[in-house]
């Protein structure tokens, strides 16, 4: 069974870009559009997966996200968070909150194919 891939963003263009990369690697991405949807999806996944969080355009503030997902994902899920390079202040805040590997959006796009192939 393929590892679940969840993307938290409201950015429709970026959703399309991530889904294209995923399809090119034979994967499918689920876009989560609400905090309730996130909890239901995480609880409903029998397999651990990859949670990709847009720190600027997530469906709710990432500070709130961090507190909600810690108990749901634990060590089972890998989390990658990304931000625009013009908002570099988000990096330290996200790392402090434990939102996984945190990187600029441009780097995320660059490493995404290899990341998906490694799962």
Task: Tell where the protein language model's regions lie, with residue ranges.
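Acidic, metal-coordinating helix/loop segments flanking the phosphotransfer/catalytic sites
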Residues: 34-50
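A charged, well-structured terminal subsegment
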Residues: 112-119
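Short hydrophobic/Thr-rich beta-strand motif most characteristic of the beta2 strand and flanking loop
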Residues: 27-34
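A short, hydrophobic beta-strand element within the central beta-sheet of small alpha/beta folds
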Residues: 76-85
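Output/docking surface of receiver
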Residues: 98-110
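Conserved acidic segment of CheY-like receiver
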Residues: 3-12
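Conserved phosphotransfer microenvironments
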Residues: 52-69
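Alpha4 helix (beta4-alpha4-beta5 surface) of REC/receiver domains from two-component response regulators
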Residues: 86-100
């Amino acid at each position: 069974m393929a590892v679940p891939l969840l993307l938290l963003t409201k950015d429709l263009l970026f959703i399309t870009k991530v889904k294209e990369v995923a399809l090119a690697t034979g994967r499918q991405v689920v876009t989560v559009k609400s905090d309730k949807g996130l909890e239901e999806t995480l609880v409903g996944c029998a397999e651990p997966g990859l949670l990709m969080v847009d720190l600027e355009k997530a469906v709710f503030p990432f500070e709130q996200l961090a507190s909600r997902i810690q108990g749901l994902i634990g060590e089972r899920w890998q989390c990658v968070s990304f931000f625009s390079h013009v908002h570099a202040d988000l990096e330290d805040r996200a790392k402090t909150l434990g939102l996984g590997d945190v990187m600029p959006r441009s780097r995320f796009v660059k490493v995404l194919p290899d990341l998906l192939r490694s799962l």
